[in-house]
Amino acid sequence: MSTMIMDLCSYTRLGLTGYLTSRGIKKQEIVEVNSAADLQKHCTSCCPAVVFLNEDCFVHDDESNGIIRQIITQNPATLFVIFMSLANIHFDRYLRVRKNLLISSKSITPKDLDVILVNYLKYKNTSVGQLTLPTLSLSKTESNMLQMWMAGHGTSQISTQMNIKAKTVSSHKGNIKKKIQTHNKQVIYHIVRLTENITSGIQVNMR
């Protein structure tokens, strides 16, 4: 299972390498890359099964951000796991936001990785189509409400502008928190912005 790691933190790189080798992946199948351009070059030449990358490696640079977005689109058979940079906030979950893209906390455990990579580790060359994790999606109403919420509108403002009851707004907020698996507004905003950076945003169910 060819794997690439792009992370500035040596502890994370060592931890991931140790985890992968303990699960039977050979060291020569694990490649460390230092930049988005370097990752693009490697993905073009060998099409890795899994890529782990830290958002800090690209999110602050428009060019790197664009390259990562392009890489994810051009490699639909590769699973990309992006670690969020969240300072002093407890969040230990992971979310599938596209068929081949997961956004994860750095607090992810080996047990969590076993769940995510079970088919990869078992078959070594499986495709993302065999991932059993559900893909995060919001209803059109939830999506519209979330944008207003992120723009700083309170429940009463959202209620008035969307012409719905305040308790319905609260219910939608509860659904969003449940789907994103956190009650922390800062984490929700972070996940939404990161998803928008590298995709067209959280998927919206138009039905």
UniProtKB/Swiss-Prot annotation:
Entry keyword Transmembrane: no
Transmembrane feature ranges: none
UniProt KW Transcription regulation keyword: yes
Keywords: DNA-binding, Sensory transduction, Transcription, Transcription regulation
Biological processes, Gene Ontology terms: regulation of DNA-templated transcription
An example Gene Ontology molecular-function term: DNA binding
Superkingdom of the organism of origin: Bacteria
Location of the DNA-binding region in this protein: 155-174
Domain HTH luxR-type, first and last residues per copy: 131-196
InterPro entries given in the database record: RcsA, Sig_transdc_resp-reg_C-effctor, Tscrpt_reg_LuxR_C, WH-like_DNA-bd_sf
Protein family membership: Belongs to the RcsA family.
Described function: Component of the Rcs signaling system, which controls transcription of numerous genes. Binds to DNA to regulate expression of genes.
Protein name (record): Transcriptional regulatory protein RcsA
Organism (species): Klebsiella aerogenes
Upper lineage: Bacteria, Pseudomonadati, Pseudomonadota, Gammaproteobacteria, Enterobacterales
Gene: rcsA
